[in-house]
Structures are given as C-alpha cells and as structure tokens.
Amino acid sequence: MHSPGAAAYVFLQCLVALVAAVIAQSGADQPPTTVVEVTAHGSVSMTPPTPRSPLLNETELVELNQPGSTAVFVALPTNPPTVSVDSSSTTTVASTQEPTSTTERTMSPEEIQKLLLPPATVEADILHVNATDDNRPDAKSSGKDSECPTLEGADHLSQTQLLTRLTHVCRYDRLERPKRESINGTNGPVKVYARAYIYFMQNLEAHDLQFKIHALLQFRYVDPRLVFREVAPNRTKPIMGEQSLRDLLWVPHVFLANERSSDILGTAEKDILTSISPDGTVIVSTRISATLYCWMNLQKFPFDEQHCSTVLESWMYNEDDLVLLWEHKSPVTLAPELHLTEYVLLEMFTNETVINADLSDLRHGAFAGNYSSLSFTVHLAREMGFYMMDYFIPSIMLVAISWVTFWLQADQSAPRITLGTSTMLTFITLASAQGKTLPKVSYIKASEIWFLGCTGFIFGSLVEFAFVNTIWRRKRNVEVKKVNSKHVLKQAITPRPARKDMSGLHKSHSCTSLADSATTVSANSFNNYLTVHSIPQKSPSSATLPIISTTDVDRAMTEASNVTIQIEGQTSNVNGNGWTTMTPQEVAIWIDKRSRFVFPIAFVIFNIFYWTFVYYV
C-alpha cells in the first residue's frame, strides 16, 4: 500500500511533465521563463508563463508543506529555457542564467492553488489575490487608494458605499472603543447615555420573586471615527441600518444584572435599529423581553409595597474606559396604556452608581475594578380589592357564623358541634388557598396574623360550648357571692358546697335529678331533697355523733318551691350572708348571654389593632 506522500509525489511529477510540454510547445512564439521544482518532501518552484501575468520572467518558490507558505520571486532574462530531468528526487525546469533580484512575500494556500491553474486564468486570479490581501485584518495601510479607499466625493456615494469606506479596516477597528480626549489631554472614558421605554410590565409573581417587562433600550454615544460631516457636507440625514450595520460598529456591551432570562424581540428579523449621525453620534435601539428578579418583602402581605429595579451594568469596560449615564430628559418612560391588575404604580426613579468587582466574586468574569451601573426602580403598591372580596370579608363572615352557637341551648350538642367544626374547616381551606401563591418564607406575614386571630375566635366559640355544656350537665347548685363575671366563672370552674347559716345549724342541700319523672318535676326540676342538720359541738364532752333528720319528699319540694334565683331581672335567693344560689343551667345560660357580647366586642378590638398596624405602622 502506497502512502499519501508517495501518491502526492507521483501527481506532482506528472504535473511537471505536463507543464514542461506546454512550455516546449509555446517556446517558439514566446520565450517564457518557468521554474518548477518538486522535491520528495513536497516542495514546488514554479513561474506560470503568461504574457498578461505580472509574474512574467519571475520564479515563485512555494513551500507546500508549511502553513503561510513563502513565495520567492526571481527576475530572469528572457532566454529560452533549458529542461533537465534526471533520476533523482528533484525535477527542475529553469533558465541558464542566475537571477538578478529576489523578493519575498507570504502567500496563502489558495494562492498556491491559483498558481497551478492554466495560464488563461492567472490574471483574474492575481486580481482576486490582491483584493483578498486588501481585506485581510492584518493588512497594513500604505496610503494607496487600492488599500484604503478615499472619502472624496462622499456626497455622491450611496449609504452602503459611504458606510463601507468609513468602516474600512484601514481607518476603523470595531474591537477598539472610541477615543475621547479629556481636559488634561488623556484618553478619557466613553460616555454612553441610556434611555428606556416600557411597553409592558407583568404583575409580580410572588412565589417566584420575579417580574417581566417588554422595553426599548436605547444607547447613545459619540464615535469620532464615524464623523462624515466634513467629507459629505450635503449629507444631513443619518445613516440608518439594522443588525448588519450594528455588526460593523463598536457597540458598548451592557447587560442586565438582575436578569433571569431575556430575548430580543422581532418576527422575521431582530428589532435592532442603528443610526450614525454626521457628527459621529451613534444610537443603538433594541426591543427586548426580559424576566427580572425582584427581591420582595412580604411581611405586610397583602398590604405590601414593593420596589423592583432594572439594573444595567457595563460588562467589559470599567469606569476608566466607559461611563453609563441616564439621558437628562425623560430617561425612563412608561407607555400610557400600561396598566397593572394587581398593583398600582406609586412612583418611579432612576439611579446612577458604581459597582465594585474583585477577583473573588467573579461578578465581571476575571476582571476587577469599578464598573458603571444604571438602574430604574418602580414603587408598586398591591391592590386590596381582590383580597378583601376573596379572603378578608369571607373570613369575617365565618367568624360571625361561629357566634350563632351562643343562641343555641347548651345541651344541644349536635348542632353546636357541627356548626363550630364546619366553620373552622371552611376558614382553614380559605386561608390555605391564599398561601399557595406565596413563597415559603420564615418570617410571619400580616395575612398570617389575620389567620391566627380569626382561628382563635372560631376556636374560642368551640371551647365556650364545651365549657357551658359541661356546666349544664352538673347536678349541684352554685353559690356565688356576687352575680358578676368574676364570681360566676370562679364558682363555675371550681364549685364549692352550698352555704347557708341557719341559727347555729349548718344546713346543706343536695339534689338528684330524675329525668324519667319529668312530668312530676317542680319548676326548678328538682324532685328529691335531702336536708342534713349539723349541730355544732359546744364542748369536747358533748355527744360525738351529730343528729341527722330527714324530711319527706313533699316537705322538701314545698321548701324548694320557695327558693328563687336572680336571673336577668328576677329576684335571687340571697341568704343572710349575701350569697346567691344558682343552678348549673342558669350558670350556662348566663355564660352564653355574656359571650354574645364579649366575642363580637373582642373581635372589633382585634380589627382596630390589626388595620392600624397594616396602614400606619
């Protein structure tokens, strides 16, 4: 198997033979000088013979096996060539005289291929090579029109022609920022003025801490290299273009520091507008859609106010090379039809600052320094209409419904339990629906304070029912010193035996409620009394056992019928010591009646404190 190098060598040998034959055939009419040298390692020396070629009577030495091959031009007299072929690894076709001059220049592989073309195409190929050399980035300006096009007669040039000459590599480098002379003569920073127009702003998404805008960002700066006022005095309109024009110019790289995602708007093409004024002022306008982070404070949710900023920063150049400034007139403008459904815009303000970046935080890649920054902030307040109708008013109604149990009798357990538990579950469901739209934060929010307050009142009504139901089922009367909240609740929680002083005898009553004999029960629902008289001992020598006597049921009922309890305007059974006897049912009813007023008044007081905190603290 032959190696690729051997195959290439055979091909070059055939090519040399073909060229030698062509030279020999045309030697009678024209004495060209062509040198073609092929070595084993792939070296070729050749001069294409053509009358129109500027390379006539020159030898071009090309090293094919090295990048950026070198061509050597050797001027030779126009003597007939001699051809010598031997069995060595080198074939040479050359004239018999030594070269008189030698010049060198670098040729690309494309030029080498063109040298191997037939003679008829050499002139066109050489023109192509010259044009390629003029447009190379590393080409040096020599002052010739072919290398650096002139700006004379710019008034008669088209916009594309003028732009092509202004941005030619001989006079413009798009990788280099514009130079601006400062007061002391040094190269000062480029001043870039910014302006923003907000088309659309989406409501803040609290659970993602972000908002979305559609805006037009415009940057204005002066590039002295693009001034054409002197060369084209009659051209007063700016040069306009889109993305293609922007790609030819130096443009400041400004990024959104709090960006989550962004994109340039546009359908068929991106919405980028670039203009160059005669005085060199460049304006670049871009329509963007951006999703930005907004770090919200939800402590007063849903009565919160948020400050959301859009931050612009210079990416590549620090403040020594580039300074960002807001336009003095209307730096940020909102579209008249812009309307937010959940928020109301209170104010908007702009700011110019400097951001310090060091190598530790990598804020600007591997660069450290002070970078210019711009920001505009919107102050938004949340609208309360939705939350009032969807959360606060329904929760107030649920709390009020829980108070209906105070008008039901204490022994009606089923309706009171059903009403209390259903109210509690409904309110928890209502509150959980609101919490799903919020992020999970560690601090307490205003909505959670409201939730805890309403839950406390609903739970309090359930506790009140359990309390009065327990008292209702007691079978022992309660004696209170005074019929007020302090004494009634104290005796209801920790009941004591009834006290009655009977002229030296301590008399106590106990009753047994017989539910089965409801038809014979007295007005106070007591049908059996046992009276125990205790005779105090006069001295230690007296009888050691007390005398106990019982009365029959009729006498007990007769005596009990003479006892009355003071309940809302009725006379109470007050003994000589000022104690009042109340039945358990009367205590339960008394607590329910007081709860009908205490709970609403307490809820009103809670609302006063809550709404004062929300709006004034």
Swiss-Prot record:
Matching entries from Gene3D superfamilies are given as: Neurotransmitter-gated ion-channel ligand-binding domain, Neurotransmitter-gated ion-channel transmembrane domain
Named from the GO MF annotations, one term is: transmembrane signaling receptor activity
The answer, when asked if Cell inner membrane is one of the entry's keywords, is: no
One GO cellular component, as annotated: plasma membrane
Give the keywords, sorted. Cell membrane, Glycoprotein, Ion channel, Ion transport, Ligand-gated ion channel, Membrane, Signal, Transmembrane, Transmembrane helix, Transport
User: One GO biological process from the UniProt record?
Assistant: chloride transmembrane transport
Q: How does it sit in the membrane?
A: Multi-pass membrane protein
Q: Which residues lie on this side of the membrane: Extracellular?
A: 29-387, 435-447
One Pfam family this sequence matches: Neur_chan_memb
- Leader sequence residues: 1-28
Question: Region labeled Disordered — which residues?
Answer: 82-110, 131-155
Residue ranges, compositional bias (Polar residues): 97-106
Q: Which residues lie on this side of the membrane: Cytoplasmic?
A: 409-414, 469-596
Indicate where this protein resides in the cell. Answer: Cell membrane
Q: Which residues cross the membrane?
A: 388-408, 415-434, 448-468, 597-617
Q: Which residues are glycosylated?
A: N57, N130, N184, N234, N351, N370
What is the stated purpose of this protein?
A: Ligand and pH-gated channel that mediates chloride transport in the mid-gut and thereby may function in larval metabolism and fluid homeostasis. Channel opening is triggered by zinc binding or, to a lesser extent, an increase in extracellular pH.
Which PANTHER family does the entry mention?
NEUROTRANSMITTER GATED ION CHANNEL (PTHR18945)
Q: Which family does it belong to?
A: Belongs to the ligand-gated ion channel (TC 1.A.9) family.
Q: What is this protein called?
A: pH-sensitive chloride channel 2
Q: Which organism is it from?
A: Anopheles gambiae (African malaria mosquito)
